């Protein structure tokens, strides 16, 4: 059972918005109704006269200090730092919902009413919604320096020549949508001051230690003067890997004498003013021989980062790096540009660029298989990454690669050959199709980012162990896995290990936070090191108490035993702990601490199999069966792993078939910033979700495991697209596959 299960299902778990303090005030933004322009004048007299309003701040009142918001590890290299293009409030609005002022009031309703009473005169500027328009010679600059944020290329050599020399070439133009994370808990931060020099922030964040640093930078105060407390988090999926409302909450309390100020965003504001997934436009080429050997492929990517940089070009760059592991024995070229537009800012979202890139690669490979008459599973087996291969861009060796086994296992469970045969030569309105797609994904951010994790273990008087880690639990089950790691390594029952889920930057060992599917991989060495050290101290103390050599003793199921007679307990940990605490001379509280940097980053692999039916007349896709098979190394907790995979599959189905932020191409106004008009899949839309695992030990890992949090979403859309193509003969390269888009494509193909 998850260690946080009871607290959550009984309602005892306290999330940020559950915290109410005496004298607490509430802040609400005044936001731009236009996507690009200047606030010429502002009139807040009516708002200020409303009873209960404490203060109104505009762009003129906030520090003139640009700051970056991305949840990336800090770097000593100035050239590698994120672009600082944010301000707390701005006169130059760059997207629909940009913030120009903020109202603080005694209660939330008054703050909302007052914000609505603020009137602003606007000077509108040209609106740009696509990267193509942003790069036009006559495009209005959204930021100083132009609309091209960054561009990069990576290549294994003369890739175009290799593609041209192959027996068959395939090309494709692919487009993916802007979508929102839609985590259950919205974005909330609460800040106050206990003295004149220090600000405390309680926040729903994935990255408390990074929040501390960014708040310090935004307000130009020492980082140590900021304390960040992360409570229970109701999901993030990357949106809370940005520093969102914490700097504003900190600014407000500092200006209002240290009183508690809460900044909570509505669901509509989460759509407009937090982060989204980057929309990609990808032009791809691929060369394949008649026997199915992939000779080479190239991708040219345009990434839409929206109005502010956030994670910016790192998304496009990461997508190209992560897919390189998938089919490493071929030539590979990847070029990408990231552009500013007047859309809501895009940032990190589950998969971090990989879903977009994999959609293009796996669509092209499937089209090549169809043209060459090769089974889609066979062409992937022929080219799949294997142990001993190397990343073609970096030369990093792949020590564990279970992709062939995933394909074979999935093919058997899914009954691929039988289902594929049933889908041949179909006529009529209802047509079935099967599809498959693969992925590769890394286990942290190294070497692009510094990977560090810390752990502290303290033994209580009853022999139980408290664990403090900077790695954040945000709903994915990290605390449960951490308790298993410590319990196994020390030699105690899991029930005797308590992970302190609340991170506090004043107390908790340093860790950047939850992102990049890094948590269990990067935290594991620190937890294991601390656990081994604590075990060593326990046995040393037991040796003194029992007049034994420490070499003769070990710890099993919470009891000290002789190595040669493990079935006979000599002493319980409770008895040992009481002696360590209260013996008049020997001992002390037994504890251990470790901080370790990780310099390995193995890839995980896997695939999705899908069986679906297309109703051509209704332009509707119904998924009959879907299966994900993963190589994530040793599976630490099968139930948690299954839950992660099912959640990712559901998100992948949403991205493939339903979800899209509808943004007016001319005005930049978001037309569906709510959960009624933004179509997410609900229970009736999802089939039975199936998962399976291929457990191949990863030798670079502390416990033999690799990434699992993000990978399940990555191949789903491509597999669905490929199945729709098999069912209808129509290759649709733009997501999502909504009824409207299916109608347009089927009409062009002459099916309707």
From Swiss-Prot:
The keyword Phosphoprotein does not apply. InterPro entries: Ald_Oxase/Xan_DH_a/b (IPR000674), Ald_Oxase/Xan_DH_a/b_sf (IPR036856), Ald_Oxase/xanthine_DH-like (IPR016208), AldOxase/xan_DH_MoCoBD1 (IPR008274), AldOxase/xan_DH_MoCoBD2 (IPR046867), AldOxase/xan_DH_Mopterin-bd_sf (IPR037165), XdhA_XDHase (IPR050028). Its cofactor is Mo-molybdopterin. Keywords: Metal-binding, Molybdenum, NAD, Oxidoreductase, Purine metabolism, Purine salvage. GO terms for molecular function: iron ion binding; xanthine dehydrogenase activity. Pathway: Purine metabolism; hypoxanthine degradation; urate from hypoxanthine: step 1/2; Purine metabolism; hypoxanthine degradation; urate from hypoxanthine: step 2/2. GO terms for cellular component: xanthine dehydrogenase complex. Binds 1 Mo-molybdopterin (Mo-MPT) cofactor per subunit. It catalyses: xanthine + NAD(+) + H2O = urate + NADH + H(+); hypoxanthine + NAD(+) + H2O = xanthine + NADH + H(+). GO terms for biological process: hypoxanthine catabolic process; purine ribonucleoside salvage. Mo-molybdopterin binds at residues 206, 237, 350, 516. Its EC number is 1.17.1.4. SUPFAM superfamilies: CO dehydrogenase molybdoprotein N-domain-like, Molybdenum cofactor-binding domain. Belongs to the xanthine dehydrogenase family. Presumed to be a dehydrogenase, but possibly an oxidase. Participates in limited purine salvage (requires aspartate) but does not support aerobic growth on purines as the sole carbon source (purine catabolism). PANTHER family: ALDEHYDE OXIDASE 1-RELATED (PTHR11908:SF132), XANTHINE DEHYDROGENASE (PTHR11908). Heterotrimer of XdhA, XdhB and XdhC. NCBIfam families: PRK09970.1, XdhA_XDHase. This is Xanthine dehydrogenase molybdenum-binding subunit. It comes from Escherichia coli O157:H7.
């Amino acid at each position: 059972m998850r260690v946080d299960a009871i607290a959550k299902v009984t309602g005892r778990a306290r999330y940020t918005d559950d915290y109410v303090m005496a004298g607490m005030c509430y802040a609400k933004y005044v936001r731009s109704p236009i996507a690009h322009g200047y606030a010429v004048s502002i009139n807040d007299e009516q708002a200020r006269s409303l009873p209960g309003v404490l203060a109104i701040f505009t762009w003129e009142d906030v520090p003139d200090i640009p700051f970056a918001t991305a949840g990336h590890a800090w770097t000593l290299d100035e050239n590698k730092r994120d672009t600082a293009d944010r301000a707390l409030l701005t006169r130059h609005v760059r997207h629909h919902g940009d913030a120009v002022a903020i109202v603080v009031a005694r209660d939330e309703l008054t703050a909302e009413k007052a914000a609505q009473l603020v009137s602003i005169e606007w000077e509108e500027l040209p609106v740009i919604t696509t990267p193509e328009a942003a790069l036009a010679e006559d495009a209005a600059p959204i930021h100083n320096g132009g609309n091209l944020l960054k561009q990069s290329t990576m290549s294994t050599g003369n890739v175009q020549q290799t593609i041209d020399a192959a027996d068959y070439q395939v090309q494709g133009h692919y487009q993916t949508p802007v979508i929102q994370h839609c985590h259950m808990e919205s974005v909330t931060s609460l800040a106050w001051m206990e003295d004149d020099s220090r600000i405390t922030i309680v926040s729903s964040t994935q990255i408390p230690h990074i929040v501390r640093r960014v708040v310090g930078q935004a307000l130009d105060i020492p980082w140590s003067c900021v304390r960040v407390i992360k409570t229970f988090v109701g999901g993030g999926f990357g949106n809370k890997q940005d520093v969102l409302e914490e700097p504003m909450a900190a600014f407000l309390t500092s200006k209002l004498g240290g009183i508690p100020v809460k900044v909570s965003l509505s669901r509509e504001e989460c759509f407009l003013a937090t982060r989204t997934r980057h929309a990609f436009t990808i032009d791809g080429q691929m060369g394949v021989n008649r026997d199915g050997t992939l000779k080479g492929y190239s991708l040219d990517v345009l990434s839409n980062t929206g109005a502010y940089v956030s994670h910016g070009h790192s998304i496009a760059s990461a997508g190209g790096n992560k897919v390189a592991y998938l089919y490493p024995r071929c030539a590979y070229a990847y070029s990408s540009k990231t552009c500013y537009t007047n859309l809501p800012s895009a940032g990190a979202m589950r998969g971090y660029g990989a879903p977009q890139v994999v959609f293009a690669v796996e669509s092209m490979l499937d089209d090549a298989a169809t043209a060459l008459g090769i089974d889609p599973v066979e062409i992937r087996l022929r080219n799949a990454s294997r142990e001993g291969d190397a990343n073609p861009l970096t030369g990093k060796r792949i020590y564990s690669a279970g992709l062939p086994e995933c394909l074979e296992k999935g093919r058997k469970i899914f009954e691929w050959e039988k289902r594929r045969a049933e889908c041949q030569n179909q006529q009529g309105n209802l047509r079935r199709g099967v599809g498959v797609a693969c992925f590769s994904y890394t286990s942290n951010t190294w070497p692009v980012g510094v990977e560090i994790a810390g752990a502290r273990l303290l033994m209580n008087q009853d022999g139980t162990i408290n664990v403090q880690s900077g790695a954040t639990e945000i709903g994915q089950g990290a605390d449960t896995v951490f308790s298993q790691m410590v319990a196994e390594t020390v030699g105690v029952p899991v029930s005797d290990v308590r992970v302190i889920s609340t991170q506090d930057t004043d107390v908790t060992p340093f860790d950047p936070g939850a992102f990049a599917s890094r948590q269990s991989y990067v935290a594991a060495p620190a937890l294991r090191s601390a656990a081994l050290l604590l075990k060593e101290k326990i046995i040393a103390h037991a040796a003194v108490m029992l007049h034994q050599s420490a070499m003769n003793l070990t710890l099993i199921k919470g009891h000290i035993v002789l190595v040669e007679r493990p079935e006979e307990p000599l002493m319980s940990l409770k008895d040992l702990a009481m002696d360590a605490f209260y013996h008049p001379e020997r001992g002390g509280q037994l504890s251990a601490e470790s901080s370790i940097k990780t310099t390995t980053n193995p890839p995980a692999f896997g695939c999705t199999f899908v069986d679906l039916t297309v109703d051509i007349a209704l332009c509707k896709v119904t998924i009959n069966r879907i299966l994900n098979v993963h190589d994530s190394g040793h599976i630490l907790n099968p139930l948690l792993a299954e839950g992660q995979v099912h959640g990712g599959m559901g998100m992948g189905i949403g991205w493939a078939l339903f979800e899209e932020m509808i943004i007016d191409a001319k005005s930049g106004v978001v037309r569906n910033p709510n959960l009624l008009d933004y179509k997410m899949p609900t229970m009736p839309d999802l089939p039975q979700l199936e998962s399976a695992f291929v457990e191949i030990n990863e030798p670079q890992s502390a416990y033999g495991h690799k990434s699992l949090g993000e990978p399940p979403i990555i191949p789903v859309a491509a597999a669905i697209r490929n199945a729709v193509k098999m069912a209808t003969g129509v290759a649709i390269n733009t997501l999502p596959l909504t009824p409207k888009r299916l109608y347009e494509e089927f009409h062009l193909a002459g099916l309707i």
